[in-house]
Amino acid sequence: MKINKNSAAAKVPFIKPNVNVMYQIDFKRDDSKPKDPETNIHKYGCNFMCCLAVPQFMNKKKLRSSQIIDIYLYAVKSGWIEYDCTVIKPNEVMNYTAQVLGDKKYRYANVFVKGIASDLDWNVSNYQHTSDLPGNGNIYFFIVDFLTGSSGNYGGHHFELYNSIGTLMYDPANCTVHKYKGVNKISCYKVFLKK
């Protein structure tokens, strides 16, 4: 996912991976416990872990595994994610994570989700002319949903975090997923300063 280096999108600030955040494979897996938080984070937690990574990078603070499990349990109870880590309300997950980290400066929000299968001509540079997108020093990032073609550990999908110029910032599987069948969708997020 690359954009023109001279575009407006290339000139916005972007998140830097400045802390060593945990990977989903750092959590122990026990297939005999289908609703075990660690097992579900290990097997299916890539999108969930991407949502947790952004506030950690913005605040330069790393969550402990116990905090991640607490966030998982709270998010399930609140209806923001399902037990299998399917993220339903990413804004709430990110903003609650920021709260756990003591973040009083930033707010995180989804700007748009673009299904690639529904618009094969779309590419990342298309967003640079949208009024709400890059410019004015705003920080943007993408969570990309890749199709893996298997229903194994990652349920046929794998999610990775990219900055606004298309550079991979975080792979929650720590590069253990190697074969992609294409992109399913791209979710664009914006970091706002709280007022």
What are these regions (language model features)?
Residues 55-195:
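Conserved active-site-adjacent core of cysteine acyl-enzyme catalytic domains
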